[in-house]
Design a protein with these regions (language model features):
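Extracellular ligand-binding interfaces
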Residues: 413-491, 499-521, 530-533, 540
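Sec-dependent bacterial lipoprotein signal peptides
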Residues: 1-19
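Short, solvent-exposed loop/turn segments at secondary-structure junctions
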Residues: 72-74, 121, 159, 208-210, ...
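Bacterial Sec-dependent N-terminal signal peptides
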Residues: 18-48
Length: 540
């Protein structure tokens, strides 16, 4: 899925060395200090770790409960082709620019680890070299996580998956041979950049890698099951994982013992009983050979339906049993690197029950968990605050226990304005995404911090059916638009403020309210639709 929808340095050199603000180690002489000539030293051994790292099993305990900084550093299509412009890509899927404050908030709420999905292919030159601007931004976000006192996982994300044009990592023998050199060069660059970071930084080999047919659930599902095709896909997954481990270890330093994460085919977890091949991704996953013992972690993802809670607990419990049977038995722990639900409209009560149960059950079994987004997303990250506070509380209490008291700020704690930066011609800000029954509502009113130039902004109201629209030019800083049922039908499905230019433009929305038939006002929360970025500005 889009999912529509990765430092601190500790090193001893002579007595000890100081780390620069970017987290890299400076040794004597590197900053231009005079160094006295010395006799040629004896040949040095292979570079070793600066510090001893905890084992993979210990890391699961140390990480605590985790969250995904999703739709942030992994977008692969944004309407932009400049892979150096990190801000455009980071905000391209509706998220605010990541800040240290966001990471501090997650730590204070009780989270101990952040998975930072990163896509790389759109940020590399023709020779596979990552643009320095992009690598610097990834480095900066990693530092935010570690500076907050949490663990961090970075990976190769939407370079895998179902997009046939952009997913250049494919689980097949031919796919591996085509991508091997580029894949290994990419991991060499990442590993060298972070070589001296401490044990709180983990690397993840790849995200949800699929076969040539882009099969989910198990290999060779989409084109009619072929045992030879499936075997080739599973072998490729293991080959990619081995390449990853070998390349990272070869860079030396702390990478010699860094805990590394390898994913099953498609990050599939084997759940369900509707096909006899569902367990194949687990049965065919192999622990990569490694120079050091106990520093490999397996990863799967999980998105069960949760409408029937007892059935969910049975299915997910069996799924967790299978991780122990097929993966943990090989000598490595498991993390569920993404989890959530595929239920279309789960009740908050069901979701919170599931979240609390799952976080606690996985902790009991020694399995790590990273919830996929849906806690602080979009403009909420710019304060920062939680947009799903009940869910966040359920997760951390499921892990830490009911006696734990998390700090969970919410939007109601603040008086806010909404600063909108338009970047694209025709881009749109949601004034409201709600479906509006015109028998109950008569219009919408909003206030801006300025009167825009004539023709620059247009109120666009999406009607009941495709092609039914109502438009009105914005001509003042305070506007009221009455609904016209003859143009819209019985309801409005979305109301936006559309930008009619391609020049960068910023304006602040101070308030938005729907007008009910009885003249009472119902406040709305603006949000980015596409082509714009929204920042929340605290006014009091």
């Amino acid at each position: 899925m889009m999912k529509r929808i990765f430092i601190c340095l500790l090193a001893f050199v002579v007595s000890f060395a100081f780390a620069s603000c970017d987290g890299r180690l400076y040794k004597p002489g590197e900053k231009g200090e005079p160094v006295k000539p010395e006799p040629a030293p004896d040949p040095k051994p292979e570079p070793g770790p600066v510090t001893e790292f905890e084992t993979s099993f210990e890391a699961i305990t140390s990480m605590g409960v985790g969250w995904n900084l999703g739709n942030t550093l992994e977008p692969v299509w944004t309407g932009d082709t400049d892979g150096r412009d990190w801000r455009r890509w980071e905000t391209g899927w509706g998220q605010s620019v990541t800040t240290q404050s966001l990471m501090n908030m997650m730590k204070n709420a009780g989270f101990g680890a952040i998975r930072v999905p990163v896509s790389w292919g759109v940020h590399m030159d023709a020779d596979g070299k990552v643009y320095e601007e992009w690598m610097n931004r990834v480095n900066e976000v990693v530092d935010y996580v570690l500076n907050a006192g949490m663990y961090c996982i970075i990976n190769i994300h939407h370079d895998t998956g179902a997009d046939e044009e952009l997913a250049w990592l494919v689980a097949s023998p031919g796919g591996y041979e085509r991508a091997k050199a580029r894949y290994e060069y990419l991991w060499k660059q990442i590993a060298e950049r972070f070589r001296d970071y401490d044990q709180r930084l983990l690397f993840e080999s790849f995200n949800e890698m699929l076969d040539d047919g882009r099969s989910w659930c198990f290999a060779s599902m989409s084109l009619g099951y072929d045992a030879d095709v499936a075997a080739g896909a599973y072998k490729a997954i293991n080959d990619y994982a081995q390449s990853f481990v070998d390349v990272v270890r070869a860079t030396g330093g702390n990478n010699s013992v860094r805990n590394l994460v390898v994913n099953t085919y498609g990050a599939c977890n084997g759940a369900g009983d509707w096909n006899p091949h569902l367990l194949d991704p687990l049965k065919n996953m192999r622990m990569p050979s490694d120079k050091v013992k106990d520093h490999i972690i397996f990863q799967v993802h999980s998105y069960p339906t949760i409408d029937d809670l007892p059935a969910m607990e049975r299915e997910v419990g069996k799924m967790l049993d299978d991780q122990e049977t097929y993966l943990v038995s090989q000598g490595g722990p498991v993390i569920v690197g993404e989890w959530g639900t595929f239920s279309e409209n789960p009740t908050l009560e069901n979701y919170c029950h599931y979240a609390k149960w799952f976080a606690g059950e996985c902790k009991r079994r020694g399995i790590g968990t990273f919830h996929w987004m849906n806690l602080s997303d979009g403009m909420y990250r710019s304060i920062p605050c939680f947009n799903s506070p009940e869910l966040a509380e359920a997760i951390v209490k499921g892990y830490h226990g009911d006696g734990f008291t998390p700090v969970i700020p919410v939007i109601e704690d603040y008086n806010l304005d909404y600063q909108v930066t338009y970047r694209d011609l025709w881009s749109e800000l949601n004034l409201t995404e709600s479906s509006i029954d015109l028998s109950q509502y008569k219009g919408i009113t909003f206030e801006l911090d300025q009167t825009p130039s004539a023709g620059l902004l247009d109120v666009k109201i999406y009607g009941e059916s495709e092609g039914q629209e109502q438009h009105q030019k914005v001509s003042d800083s305070t506007m009221t638009v009455m609904f016209d049922a003859s143009q819209l039908g019985a309801k409005a499905n979305r109301i936006t403020l559309q930008y009619m230019s391609s020049t960068l433009f910023t304006i602040t929305v101070k308030s938005v309210c729907l007008i009910r038939k009885d003249e009472t006002l119902e406040p709305c929360t603006p949000s980015a639709f596409w082509g714009c970025e929204v920042q929340l500005i605290v006014t009091g």
